[in-house]
Amino acid sequence: MGLAFLAVIYIPPKGDYGDAFRVGIITPQTVFKAQAMHLKKRVLVTGGAGFLGSHLCERLLAQGCDVICLDNYFTGSKQNVMHLLDNPHFELMRHDVTFPLYVEVDEIYNLACPASPIHYQHDPVATTKTSVHGAINMLGLAKRLRAKIMQASTSEVYGDPSVHPQPESYWGNVNPIGFRSCYDEGKRCAETLFFDYRRQHNLRIKVARIFNTYGPRMHPNDGRVVSNFIIQALRGEPLTVYGQGQQTRSFCYVDDLVE
């Protein structure tokens, strides 16, 4: 049995190491090492092998966290995190958030859900379940661990807004039964659950309404405007602009989002 492991076993909560030092079981050096290990933040990122999740995993590792990356690979890819697999502080797990998960973490970032219409309309029932059941399972985990948790929501909670730009106080204009509803309403329901857990269980939550993010590792065929423009430009094709070209859209680079 290694000294570091012995240190973890014998360290009293208030730092009174007494007999353990006197009999030579542990040393001040192993105590310091064990305390440093204990203070290292352990973070769960669901959807961590996706476009956004993989960049978040990189940033958390750079900040000195232990990272558990969770993904079912529906739209995520192991290739997105292949360069992280040799990092001893990174763990990759294949798991679907619609099923309960039992891990020990300090913080949770819930990014699991297909975000492109092509992907989320492929199986709309599964999309809704991912948003709703996934939120319930991750909130339940956060409640049990008293962990901080962040929900990756979306500007799509505003639906087809009649207010531009949209303040956070705007409730939106959403079609509850349309083809996009599996995503829009699923994310709205997830936000409801997050705020109810805060009110009812005093859980530490954050909700981020993400919008039109682009950058390395975005799926080239996700049907969104930036990827469409890039693919058409690389092929030497005219860029497709729908309607009269009067639309406005805000974009966010992935590094800025993670920051």
Task: Give names to the regions the model predicted.
Residues R188, T213-N228, R235-P238, Y242-R249, ...:
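Glycine/proline-rich active-site loop of Rossmann-fold NAD(P)-dependent oxidoreductases
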Residues A20-F21, D96:
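Juxtamembrane/membrane-water interface recognition
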Residues Q29-T213, A233, G243, V254-D255:
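N-terminal Rossmann-like NAD(P)+-binding domain of SDR-like oxidoreductases, especially those catalyzing
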Residues M1-L3, P238:
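Internal intein/HINT superfamily modules and their associated LAGLIDADG
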Residues I11, G18-A20:
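Short hydrophobic alpha-helical segments enriched in small aliphatic residues
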Residues M1, D16, V23-G24:
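N-terminal amphipathic/hydrophobic targeting modules at extreme N-termini
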Residues I11-P13, T27-F32:
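Serine/threonine-rich, low-complexity intrinsically disordered segments
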